[in-house]
Amino acid sequence: MANLTEKFLRIFARRGKSIILAYDHGIEHGPADFMDNPDSADPEYILRLARDAGFDGVVFQRGIAEKYYDGSVPLILKLNGKTTLYNGEPVSVANCSVEEAVSLGASAVGYTIYPGSGFEWKMFEELARIKRDAVKFDLPLVVWSYPRGGKVVNETAPEIVAYAARIALELGADAMKIKYTGDPKTFSWAVKVAGKVPVLMSGGPKTKTEEDFLKQVEGVLEAGALGIAVGRNVWQRRDALKFARALAELVYGGKKLAEPLNV
């Protein structure tokens, strides 16, 4: 069996860094997320955007993959999800199996956990089963590690983000998606405690300005992260492709914000 972190890097970080275009928001937040840029409601638009910007992959839920995935960009199939209609303790359970992900052409699978929730045990237990299946089918497992509920007051506090990273490592992630602390120095500690597991920053809600998000990305790279898994901060923008290409210059080209970018 190949090292699945190495396999993830070969597929999703061919140039040494990674940009993944996340698009699991339809179930997580609903169609309201598509209103800023109505084109983004069309999964074919998302595939073109990822392909034309030269991104390393996309994240889809199973229904989108079944109807739209064309193999033009590597796929991370998200195995679980929740809605904003639910108002209880944070929990997200599987709606797709690793075996089904393989049949849909996925190159990796993703799963969200909410450490701190009253249901963390349920998600940890399910993640263990998914990890066994991912090893069986030779698919890297990307863990979205978002402490939430319980004692968690500030989800981006440095100690919480670092804990999230360590939990993902301990539970067998081959790559992880965690939130940014807002500062490269504190985020570098999260990257360190993630050990050998590559770190992707969660893009989060669209920032007020494009430069605000580019500054976040620059800080994340300075901290030693592999890259970003971003959705709304790209496809909610009216000129999404232009901004996506600016991100590519920053992440892949090693440009700094002090230099001219394609924005």
UniProtKB/Swiss-Prot annotation:
Identification of the protein by name: Fructose-bisphosphate aldolase class 1
Keywords: Cytoplasm, Glycolysis, Lyase, Schiff base
Catalysed reactions, semicolon-separated: beta-D-fructose 1,6-bisphosphate = D-glyceraldehyde 3-phosphate + dihydroxyacetone phosphate
Annotated active site: 146 (proton donor), 177 (schiff-base intermediate with dihydroxyacetone-p)
SS bonds (residue pairs): none
Superkingdom of this protein's organism: Archaea
SUPFAM superfamilies (alphabetical): Aldolase
PANTHER family in alphabetical order: 3-HYDROXY-5-PHOSPHONOOXYPENTANE-2,4-DIONE THIOLASE, FRUCTOSE-BISPHOSPHATE ALDOLASE CLASS 1
SMART domains in alphabetical order: DeoC
Family: Belongs to the DeoC/FbaB aldolase family.
Keyword Cytoplasm assigned: yes
Role according to the record: Catalyzes the reversible cleavage of fructose 1,6-bisphosphate (FBP) to glyceraldehyde 3-phosphate (GAP) and dihydroxyacetone phosphate (DHAP).
Pfam families the UniProt entry points to: DeoC
Gene from which this protein is expressed: fba
GO cellular component, one term: cytoplasm
